[in-house]
Amino acid sequence: MSLQLAEEIIKGRRLKRGEDLSFLLSEDLDELCAGADKIRKELCGNHVDLCSIINGRSGRCGEDCKFCAQSACHHTKVEEYPFLEPEEILEDCKRHEAKKVHRYSIVTAGRALTGAEMEKALRAYRAMKKECKVELCASHGLLSQEDFNRLKEAGVGRYHANIETSRRNFPNICTTHTFEDKLE
């Protein structure tokens, strides 16, 4: 079934959140991987994008994800600092672009950005879009549709939602937000 769905996607079919997500979550993993590989070969070939990230805000995260050193719930020695200045992020992006990186992403610890942090992020993305040729990505936790739209307008082409495990197992690794929160 995954190979048939892969053919449909290659021909332009767009997945529907509810029905297709439930199918993908129940599909045999080997078949799902074969379908995904078919799509990759057809749409991307064997090209590899190099993506570099910058930790835009580190530590003090109020979420309790068991695997994450950024969580304030765990006693780690991770460096803690507030959201970086846009100029610092831009300079780091330029350094990575000079090393032939294709994509660049700001990632931040925490459930979501504050209003002031979102404004800093948007300034950084706009500056990178203006001064660099890399594709821009983001990972800033749980955002509103309005914030996603603002990121897109600022030049962000991909967003990393980081769904770490299955719906069934999610409560075993995190209790401060749900699997469904990640999908909204």
Task: Label every model-predicted segment.
Residues 1-63, 67:
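Flexible, acidic/Gly-rich N-terminal and inter-domain linker regions that tether
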Residues 11-15, 29, 36, 40-43, ...:
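Amphipathic, alpha-helical segments enriched in basic
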Residues 47-79, 124-125, 168-171:
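N-terminal small/glycine-rich loop or linker at the start of catalytic domains
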Residues 73-92, 96-184:
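Core AdoMet radical
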